[in-house]
Curated annotation (Swiss-Prot):
A single GO molecular function term of this UniProt record: ATP binding
NCBIfam families attached to this UniProt entry: PRK04196.1, V-ATPase_V1_B
Record bears the keyword Translocase: no
Keywords: ATP-binding, Cell membrane, Hydrogen ion transport, Ion transport, Membrane, Nucleotide-binding, Transport
Source organism: Bos taurus (Bovine)
Annotated domain remarks: The PDZ-binding motif mediates interactions with NHERF1 and SCL4A7.
Annotated GO CC locations: apical plasma membrane; basolateral plasma membrane; cytoplasm; lateral plasma membrane; microvillus; proton-transporting V-type ATPase, V1 domain; vacuolar proton-transporting V-type ATPase complex
Tissue: Kidney cortex and medulla.
Record-given protein name: V-type proton ATPase subunit B, kidney isoform
Short sequence motif PDZ-binding: positions: 510-513
Localization per Swiss-Prot or TrEMBL: Apical cell membrane; Basolateral cell membrane
Length: 513
């Protein structure tokens, strides 16, 4: 029997050409780039800021990685942001300077951006794209992970309940940090936020409870540090600080400096968090992630948005910045069945000291509180210049109290807040009416204000106070007032702790002053 031959002209609807085209589109979805050779393109049609537009592209996929080869042989990588018909818009991580529209070749890899991860990354220094810059060998990868992370089932998240003791009194007593929390440092240009972050890295540890079964050993602790758009001095400060304290073996550094490409800053925090997730959930380490400076990251986001000619939001930042920041900050926490945790401390510098700026404003919505670094305290030579009034820790309530720190912790914190706030009001009133018009109670609050800033907030960069020493110091300051004025503390707590005999560690706090 003779085979039937399609006599219809090729190219017409229903002909073999359209069937072939349909088959080709179906295969494009499941295309195997190992058995099929990749297509190399020389179809760069325009370059706009950090973006390259390619034409006559087949099988392009969203978020696919593209490798560029420049005329001089230099290799660069980019990511597909948008596909429309045969055109693809690619964001180049290393910048677009030197890309020749005529001679640059590019190749689509068919894969998303993955980073090699290994426990051997601790003690190493990488650039903003994850390549080693410490003259060491390439990382022998245990796995290649998607830099956008794996979504965590909210039902499997564990509520953070173990307090981290930082050794810094205003943080430990009034803004306690729980393991697995995300809490940013709101700072501004010229303030010592780097020194505070370094001090937290040096001194951080759990408040050791009795009969604990958790692993408190130093080997179980790791730090992942990601710098975006920082100067060489800041990078050197952190690196030398880690080396001097002997913790460099437990630190993994990702450095995107001010003279590195701006667009690279978009992937730097994601590389750092992917590494942190591997160390926390596969190696079961307790990881502290420090991201500085999130303002540089947001400006890189604005640059890409402007190049794509998207409708700008407040101050020119893209409307999706809230969502984008959330994809970074939400990668903190604890997961049921895993021994590790990720605690995030992002640092951001507020432009013009403005807390209503979109970057700190949106960050405050997503994160679980903030630590506010104040310029007026810094100008008065107080270190760390942490203003406790705008500072907040939303998870503090579950990390303190009897069995975790001490039963008077919450009440002492509330009373210190109340007295300091009233003291600030009295100070403002004194500037208007003069000291003679103040009552004796007002003068007590004024005295407390000065003592609080000089003795409680102020401490040395290498001075570590335990949470119990800080609480006893708080009681020492509260004894400025008669018992009747301490309205935020229950009577049974006052009876137990107010008298000097009731606080056995108070003599140690005296000598510390």
């Amino acid at each position: 029997m003779a085979a039937e031959v399609d006599s219809r002209p090729r190219g017409l609807p229903g002909g073999g050409a359209s069937l072939g085209a349909a088959r080709e589109h179906v295969q494009a979805v499941t295309r195997n780039y190992i058995t099929h050779p990749r297509i190399t393109y020389r179809t760069v049609c325009s370059v706009n800021g950090p973006l390259v537009v390619l034409d006559q592209v087949k099988f392009a996929q969203y978020a696919e990685i593209v490798n560029f080869t420049l005329p001089n042989g230099t290799q660069r990588s980019g990511q597909v942001l948008e596909v429309s018909g045969t055109k693809a818009i690619v964001q180049v991580f290393e910048g677009t300077s030197g890309i020749d529209a005529q001679k640059t070749t590019c190749e689509f890899t068919g894969d998303i951006l993955r980073t090699p991860v290994s426990e051997d990354m601790l003690g190493r220094v990488f650039n903003g794209s994850g390549k080693p810059i410490d003259k060491g060998p390439v990382v022998m990868a245990e796995d290649f992970l998607d830099i956008n992370g794996q979504p965590i089932n909210p039902h499997d998240r564990i509520y953070p309940e173990e307090m981290i003791e930082t050794g810094i009194s205003p943080i430990d007593v009034m803004n306690s940090i729980a393991r697995g929390q995300k809490i940013p440092i709101f700072s501004a240009a010229g303030l010592p936020h780097n020194e505070i972050a370094a001090q937290i890295c040096r001194q951080a540890g759990l408040v050791k409870k009795s009969k604990a079964v958790l692993d408190y050993h130093d080997d179980n602790f790791a730090i992942v540090f990601a710098a975006m758009g920082v100067n060489m001095e800041t990078a050197r400060f952190f690196k030398s600080d880690f080396e001097q304290n002997g913790t460099m073996g437990n630190v993994c550094l990702f450095l995107n400096l001010a003279n590195d490409p701006t667009i690279e800053r978009i992937i730097t925090p994601r590389l750092a968090l992917t590494t942190a997730e591997f160390l926390a959930y596969q190696c079961e380490k307790h990881v502290l992630v420090i991201l500085t400076d999130m303002s540089s990251y947001a400006e890189a986001l604005r640059e890409v948005s402007a190049a794509r000619e998207e409708v700008p939001g407040r101050r020119g930042f893209p409307g999706y910045m809230y969502t984008d920041l959330a994809t970074i900050y939400e990668r903190a926490g604890r997961v049921e069945g895993r021994g590790g945790s990720i605690t995030q401390i992002p640092i951001l510098t507020m432009p013009n000291d403005d807390i209503t700026h979109p970057i700190p404003d949106l960050t405050g919505f997503i994160t679980e509180g903030q630590i506010y670094v104040d310029r007026q305290l810094h100008n008065r030579q107080i270190y760390p210049p942490i203003n406790v009034l705008p500072s907040l820790s939303r998870l503090m309530k579950s990390a303190i109290g009897e069995g975790m720190t001490r039963k008077d912790h919450g009440d002492v914190s509330n009373q210190l807040y109340a007295c300091y706030a009233i003291g600030k009001d009295v100070q403002a009133m004194k500037a208007v009416v003069g000291e003679e018009a103040l009552t004796s109670e007002d003068l007590l609050y004024l005295e407390f204000l000065q003592k609080f800033e000089k003795k409680f907030i102020n401490q040395g960069p290498y001075e570590k106070r335990s949470v119990f020493e800080s609480l006893d110091l708080g009681w020492k300051l509260l004894r400025t007032f008669p018992k009747e004025m301490l309205k935020r503390i229950p009577q049974n707590i006052i009876d137990e702790f107010f008298s000097r005999e009731g606080a056995p560690q108070d003599t140690e706090a005296d000598t510390a002053l």
